[in-house]
Amino acid sequence: MLKRAHYVALHVTLNHNGLSYQRVFSCLTQFPMLRHSSTAAKNNVSMISKFQAPEDKFFPSFSLKSMPKQSSHMSASLLNSLNTSMKKSFSRKKYREAVSLFRKNLWKYEESWIRNQDFIDCCIIACSAYEKLCQPLRIKKTFIILSQLCPKLPAELCRVFLSYATGCVNYGHNVALTCFENSPKELIDYNYWLSWLSFSKSSPVVLWLTFTRISSAGLSPNAETFEILLVAFASQKNFWFFEKTYDLFMQSKLTWRPFTYRVLIESFMKFGNFEEAEKLAYSYVKNKIDSLSSDVFFSAILKFYAVGGDFQGFKKLLSFMTDYNVNFSVSTLNQLLRLNLYHAMDEKISTFSSEHITKLIEQQIKPDLESMLIISEYLNEYKPSPKMRELINWLYSNFHLPKTVSLHFLREVQSLVFRYPLLHSKIHLAISTLKDSGCDWNVGLSYLNWLFVNKRITEAINFFYTITINAGTRPPNELFDVFISNLLKFTSAETTSSAIRKVQSKYPSMCGSSPAIKLILFSKSFSVLQSTSEKIEQLLVSFQRNPSAYSKSFTLALAEWLFSRRLFQSALLYSFKVSDVDDSHFSFRSQILICWCYYRLNDFKSLIQHTNNLLQSNNASLLRRLAATLYRIQIRENNGYKRVLLDRLRKKAILRAFPSRTLNRTEKVKLYNEDAKFRSIFSRVLLHQSHLGNVIS
């Protein structure tokens, strides 16, 4: 996705008065979808934008009402002053002030504004300010408002919103498709659209149907179009669509670009077609398609040899590259490093790779981030020899991050630097790029985990507040989950309670509408709760005073936690509070939990009765879950009588879940005989029930 964003940034050149709009693609965070409603009268332009989420105070509701028409001179002067003020605020990095000016004046909109260059500049500056504030969905909202005010936007605005739509995965297919279809045909680039579908992980069918629209639009696919499709289908491991695209590409007889060879070589390697990939690599060099042949075309093949330990194949290919004067780069250095590290016990391989690494270093080829990651992964698994340690230290001392790097490189540094001890000295760079290029939630999650692991609790709490409450952005559930889980693990119950109440006061929907804090709602927290029972008990005591605390979700989560603590009797009591048989997810989980509680309490009679009650249900989903649960219990049961009973109940649940399976007369007779046998076994089990140890009674 980030590679595609960088590609779009290179191909969309927008610059106005020194303001760069190519960084619109750093806003790849996830925000809640905003709901809106709009009304438009025929002669009275009116629009009401109402946000349902209570935390969305940054973009308040407003309406465009009919205003007395101003003269063209007054309108032009207003737009000119607005444009000047917004530029001044943007240049001073007061982005909130810039968008506030834009919102306050948007309700004065007139039809003549859309043709005014000052108004177009104001829209572009507002979008850039939202990008700086890491609010890509506000840009989407701006596009919706402007498209409602003027169905046909100017080409310059269309181009801006097209670049945002292809650069941000948060737009969703519907809005991005609307942005494409409402734009002038001369601006629509189907390669943009295919690339956006590719990095948004659309299904192969959607990609193929979009590809067929190119022919229906009267256009001919070029080599870039086929490259995008081949990369997408190879990454999804869909060989059928890949082969079909490759056949069409061969039939089209288009001119192959150097990048086409690279795409095909890497794709064939992903599908395991090593011979075809090697054949393409050799033909690329022998035909001298590119006078400066790069070693990146051989990188995937060299990696295959290095990981597999095929020393002869690696040596042969490296000799071929030397004979044809292929330019070596850090790509070959990384594969030699991988061969050296993971086959260091073989003296022959170690000597060969060390010699070539020394030659490449003498050619002023310095290690990059991938080199450091290869070394870090090796150090996490193995203890290097003194000779290897000397080589690693030398490589690390020559590793320097460049001053000017691409967006993709910055994201790599941010997401990986926190996980490898070797890269911890580069954390200051990762934090600075995190602020400059926009908050990526995945990076924030990695950094938050790293702070908690290193016992920097205060910094972790402040960092969470900085990127959520102070920035005015709602955190995703996963980030909130990790934050709460680590607070439960490392801090006191009072600190956890106050932190959750602070987040809930700002974003009530994070913890539910109930004022009680539903701490155990998040599934990932259960592994942490096993070691923090005292803190949870203290929190439960403080929250039990609120009668609204016991919603279905909270009560069921509490029952599951009690079951994990082997408190089966208490878990059974809480499970019965949400045991109403309906189609809800909580009901299914509670019914299954009751079965497990009876089994762990060794109350086989109650388990059979509860199972028979569930068999009266017509809900196929519940019956399928019941059958799976009975099978798991049957595997754990050692008593032969009980195993036969459980197997019989499981078969009944399956038959009830799939009523379309009709039985012939022979099967009905067999089922009747099995019922008689079932009743006999059940009566025998009840006779020995007193010896089974009924805990509840």
Swiss-Prot record:
Signal peptide residues on this chain, from the entry's feature table: none
Compartments where located: Mitochondrion
Matching InterPro entries: PPR-containing_protein, TPR-like_helical_dom_sf
Keywords noted in UniProt: Mitochondrion, Repeat, Transit peptide
GO molecular function, one term: mRNA binding
Transit peptide range per the UniProt entry: 1-36
Main location: mitochondrion
PPR repeats: 257-288, 294-328
Organism superkingdom: Eukaryota
Example of a GO cellular component annotation carried by this entry: mitochondrial matrix
Gene ablation phenotype (knockout): Impairs growth on galactose.
GO biological process entries: mitochondrial gene expression
Role, per record: Mitochondrial RNA-binding protein required for the stability of the cox2 and cox3 mRNAs.
Protein name in the entry: Pentatricopeptide repeat-containing protein 1, mitochondrial
Organism (species): Schizosaccharomyces pombe (strain 972 / ATCC 24843) (Fission yeast)
Biological classification of the source: Eukaryota, Fungi, Dikarya, Ascomycota, Taphrinomycotina
Gene name of the record: ppr1
